[in-house]
Amino acid sequence: MSKSALVILAPGAEEMEFIIAADVLRRAGIKVTVAGLNGGEAVKCSRDVQILPDTSLAQVASDKFDVVVLPGGLGGSNAMGESSLVGDLLRSQESGGGLIAAICAAPTVLAKHGVASGKSLTSYPSMKPQLVNNYSYVDDKTVVKDGNLITSRGPGTAYEFALKIAEELAGKEKVQEVAKGLLVAYN
């Protein structure tokens, strides 16, 4: 049975982080569901690119996924942080031992919903003050994995972030194959 990923798409999401995560995971053979936070209509991202989700988050919130991916972008992260549905989903994912992945500003969503407290993580540098009290903050790594949590810093680290998620779900050999096809170095 193939692994599955839920990528939440919220208004103001960082396009690169969203696209790279969804694309890399699909290339690795993972079944990716893109769910719009506010429904199934097109979502305007941080640089005014509009993306059409597969479905609404409400439609799939009770489904089980191997990973829940939170792309960054300040607007998208704020919207996810204010969503009780996202909070319930993340707490369920955490209690069930599922993987959670957050990049850029999205680790603040974890803090707002009380998820993964005490774990090591990283984020976009300006988000650090919102995270240092509840997490072990890592400044010197572009991707941090602590148990079932994967975090990363921003748009420039999106490939490494996505490949790390893919490695967890599809294995090192498959990820090396995907990285090679993308002309991206990955160890």
From Swiss-Prot:
GO terms for biological process: adult locomotory behavior; cellular response to reactive oxygen species; glycolate biosynthetic process; glyoxal metabolic process; larval locomotory behavior; negative regulation of developmental growth; negative regulation of phosphatidylinositol 3-kinase/protein kinase B signal transduction; regulation of hydrogen peroxide metabolic process. The modification Cysteine sulfinic acid (-SO2H) is found at residues 45, 104. Expressed in the head and testis (at protein level). Ubiquitously expressed at constant levels. It comes from the Eukaryota. One of its GO terms (molecular function) is peroxiredoxin activity. It is found in: Mitochondrion; Cytoplasm; Nucleus. This is Protein dj-1beta. InterPro entries: Class_I_gatase-like, DJ-1, DJ-1/PfpI, Prot/Nucl_acid_deglycase. GO terms for cellular component: cytoplasm; mitochondrion; nucleus. Changing residue 45 to A/D: Lack of oxidation modification. Plays an important role in cell protection against oxidative stress and cell death by acting as a oxidative stress sensor. Does not play a role in methylglyoxal detoxification. Plays a role in mitochondrial function together with Pink1. In motor neurons regulates structural synaptic plasticity of locomotor behavior as part of the PTEN-phosphatidylinositol 3-kinase pathway in response to oxygen species (ROS) levels. Oxidation of Cys-45 and Cys-104 in response to oxidative stress. Levels of oxidation increase with age. It comes from Drosophila melanogaster (Fruit fly). Keywords: Cytoplasm, Mitochondrion, Nucleus, Oxidation. Its main location: mitochondrion. Disruption phenotype: Viable and fertile. Larvae develop normally but show increased oxidative stress-induced cell death. Larvae show structurally normal neuromuscular junctions, however they fail to show structural synaptic plasticity in response to oxygen species (ROS) levels. Adult flies show severe defects in locomotor ability without loss of dopaminergic neurons and increased sensitivity to oxidative stress. Results in altered subcellular localization of Daxx. Does not show more elevated levels of methylglyoxal adducts than controls. Gene3D superfamilies: 3.40.50.880. The active site is at 104 (nucleophile).
